[in-house]
UniProtKB/Swiss-Prot annotation:
Positions of region (Disordered): 1-40
Name the record gives this protein: Putative transmembrane protein DDB_G0267530
Keywords assigned by UniProt, alphabetized: Membrane, Transmembrane, Transmembrane helix
Keyword Transmembrane attributed: yes
The species this protein was found in: Dictyostelium discoideum
Subcellular location: Membrane
Bilayer-crossing regions: 119-139, 148-168
Record bears the keyword Transport: no
């Protein structure tokens, strides 16, 4: 048989390895060659088979005709709106907002004025009792001192009023008794005599005792 009658054999090629997603080749990796191994020559009339040589994986190179995927731009995350449902059994959590405000210091002179007026009314009432009636204006005062003097003024006014009523009633009663006693000491005496003319005449003498 001649050389032409021998069957033609196709050269065997190594299948291309598909790239693994997320796999990074190891840097510096070199294939280890077997010691003493030599490729055998093809027999006469057969085409020489290509010798497979393992190449180091120095970074993956895409095969010819492969178009890399175009990376798309990641959209920013959309805001998530969370709704809260009110439950009568579960209290809602609210953020405590603390607001600090500075208030100016206001010096109120009304209390001191009320205290002074209440003291004046209380003192003048000893000379003119009717002035003690002004204590009614200080009974509901916010100042404790003014309220105290106001109450004292009102109490003293009613005490003096009761004393005056008692004194007047006693004086009137005593005056009536004195008048009755004086009336008893006041009397008249009558003496009668006959005159020479035969007529009866009377003389009245009044004696008043003081």
């Amino acid at each position: 048989m001649g050389v032409e009658d021998q069957p033609q054999t196709q050269p065997q090629t190594q299948p291309q390895q598909q790239p693994q997603m997320g796999y990074q080749p190891q840097m510096g990796y070199q294939p280890q060659a077997q010691m003493g191994y030599q490729p055998q020559a093809a027999p006469m009339g057969y085409p020489q088979q290509p010798i497979y040589q393992q190449q180091p994986q120095m970074g993956y190179q895409p095969p010819m005709g492969y178009q890399p995927q175009v990376g798309y731009q990641q959209q920013p995350p959309q805001p998530v709106y969370q709704t809260y449902c009110h439950d009568d059994h579960q209290p809602l959590l609210h953020a405590n907002v603390v607001v600090t405000t500075t208030q100016p210091t206001v010096i109120r002179k009304s209390n001191s004025n009320e205290e002074t007026a209440a003291v004046i009314v209380f003192i003048i009432g000893f000379f003119f009792s009717i002035v003690w009636l002004g204590g009614f204006f200080f009974i509901k005062s916010k100042s404790k001192t003014a309220r105290t003097f106001g109450i004292l003024s009102v109490v003293f006014f009613f005490l003096v009023l009761v004393i005056v009523v008692i004194v007047v009633s006693v004086t009137v009663t005593a005056a009536e008794k004195i008048a009755e006693e004086n009336k008893d000491y006041y009397y008249s005496t009558s003496t009668g005599y006959y005159s020479t003319t035969g007529y009866y005449s009377t003389t009245t003498s009044y004696t008043t005792y003081y």
